[in-house]
């Protein structure tokens, strides 16, 4: 399998930790192991799975998707296929929630992240639903945050929260719009949802792929109202559009954020940033 190393051998690492195209990354830790997946559009096998022991040294171990269950993908389809996925671990199983912007939201599951992964199962048949992320709550409820693709459905800047059937993981209720970023967070998309210490967090990129920023929403109730705060932006650095990714906590309790940077012809490379808490109100990536 492919291995990617950006350790500079003095106790430090250099960004990007994945200096090649792994767009729209999501990652989790299970025990001592980290796993990362990314979008792959119409390339197959798709939605690559990477493994790491330290968030710096990565190895590609498999793919979540062997084929797309639609005849149209027998031919190239620019801008279609698998968009920003989410990776979660629940009750001994790995779940990858994967959007196809023209067909809907799907999931695949596995007991071993290297595979085999199940055939895609439809969560919601819909055009324009993208960037899904599930959350299994403490009371057994299951939710899914997602964004919209204006190119498909005419809706933009909004995050919706739907309720899923705990057994089938299919949408049973199209929930409310829990955040509208039209004025303050244009192009709000790519939600990643977490629950920590009684708070619901939704991490959203905003501002667009090339020059956007990272925003965090939080609320005490899953349906809000959500506070918002920009936690990372380019500033005076050379890292354009640092946003969209995963909040991961290491075994030692330290928090880290994996996100992409659009390097144009080189693709979307992945950076690793340490995180800290600021006045116990929000999280910030350095």
Task: List the model feature ranges, each with a label.
Residues 147, 162-163:
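Active-site neighborhood of glycoside hydrolase catalytic domains
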Residues 38-64:
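Beta-propeller domains
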Residues 1-28, 56-89, 116-138, 163-192, ...:
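Surface loop/turn signatures of beta-propeller and other carbohydrate-active proteins
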Residues 28-43, 83-101, 106-107, 120, ...:
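Hydrophobic core segments of beta-strands in well-ordered, beta-rich domains
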Residues 45-48, 104-106, 154-160, 211-217, ...:
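Structural motif
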Residues 278, 282-286:
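Residue-level detector of conserved catalytic or cofactor/ligand-binding positions
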């Amino acid at each position: 399998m492919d291995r990617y190393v950006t350790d500079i051998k003095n106790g430090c690492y250099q960004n990007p930790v994945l200096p090649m195209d792994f767009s729209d990354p999501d990652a989790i830790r299970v025990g001592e192991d980290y796993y990362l997946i990314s979008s792959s559009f119409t390339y197959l096998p798709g939605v690559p799975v990477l493994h790491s022991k330290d968030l710096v040294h990565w190895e590609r171990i498999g793919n979540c998707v062997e084929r797309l269950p639609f005849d149209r993908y027998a031919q190239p389809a620019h801008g279609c296929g698998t968009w920003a996925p989410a990776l979660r671990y629940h009750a001994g199983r790995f779940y990858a929630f994967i959007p196809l912007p023209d067909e809907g939201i799907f999931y695949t599951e596995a007991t071993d992240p290297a595979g085999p992964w199940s055939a895609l199962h439809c969560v919601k048949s819909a055009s324009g639903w993208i960037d899904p992320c599930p959350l299994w709550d403490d009371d057994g409820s299951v939710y899914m945050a997602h964004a919209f693709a204006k190119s498909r459905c005419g809706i933009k800047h909004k995050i919706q929260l739907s309720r899923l059937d705990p057994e089938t993981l299919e949408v049973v209720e199209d929930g409310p719009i829990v955040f509208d970023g039209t004025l303050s967070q244009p192009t709000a998309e790519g939600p990643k949802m977490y629950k920590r210490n009684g708070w619901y967090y939704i991490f959203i990129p905003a501002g667009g792929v090339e020059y956007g920023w990272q925003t965090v929403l939080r609320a005490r109730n899953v349906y809000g109202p959500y506070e918002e705060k920009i936690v990372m932006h380019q500033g005076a650095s050379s890292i354009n559009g640092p946003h969209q990714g995963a909040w991961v906590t290491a075994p030692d309790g330290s928090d880290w954020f994996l996100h992409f940077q659009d390097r144009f012809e080189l693709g979307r490379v992945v950076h690793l940033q340490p995180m800290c808490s600021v006045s116990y109100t929000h999280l910030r990536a350095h």
